[in-house]
Amino acid sequence: LGLHGPIDIQYALMVSCNYFFYEAGNRQGIDNISKYSEQLGLGSKTGIELSENTGHISNPQTFRDLRGENSEEQWTLGNVLQSAIGQLDNAFTPLQMANYVATLANDGTRMRSHLVKSVESYNLEETVSTTQPEVLNQVEASKEAFEQVREGMVRCSRDTTRGSARYYFGDYPIDVAAKTGTPQASGGELDATFIAYAPAYDPEIAVAVVVENGYSGQRGAPIARAIFDEYFGLNKEQEQQQPQTEGQLIP
């Protein structure tokens, strides 16, 4: 299959093989691609407490809506293949992508996004209100399917020879499930996208990074790593415990 030869889903995710997903898209068809994209929250509102742009999923209806009913352009099989790798008319917000990767981490349970977890009283002695978790929908896919995707994303960060995020997470102290992306933008420029969640086998945090004109999906990896470092407290310098001498000020 192209440069990589016969491969499975895990390897395809690890090395970001477009040819694999061209073939997968061809076999699934645009209706299935659209169905699962929508169930995963792409092109849909996240439920955040602000107005938001829903973006859109690449499919024949979006194709006609964007070009007009009188356009001479026709939907073709090539459009299906481009849609399958996130190109053509796919347009998603960073929050949608963060919600999407969180849904992968939750084995298909998509939660509503919120800005505030809780509100505390002015003296921090009382919790005034707490935002309750809300399930938006469940993706119609098996647990095994999500496990395969997770393992491919872990290999993306952990495999020290071929993983597309290996330079930033190959030796990271916490297992990270990650995926790089390099969508083509207008004018021939390439944006960089990076989605990830951690710990891979007991998820707590999901991250989406977009770097406009970033050229390679790897450009988002160090930003995601900095976020994980802060969240997991890995960026704190280890304080050296030195014996205190008489008259020494305590810092």
Name every feature range the model reports, one short phrase each.
Residues 185, 204, 216-218, 234:
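Intrinsically disordered, low-complexity acidic/polar segments
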Residues 1-208, 247-251:
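Beta-lactam-recognizing serine transpeptidase/beta-lactamase-like catalytic domain environment
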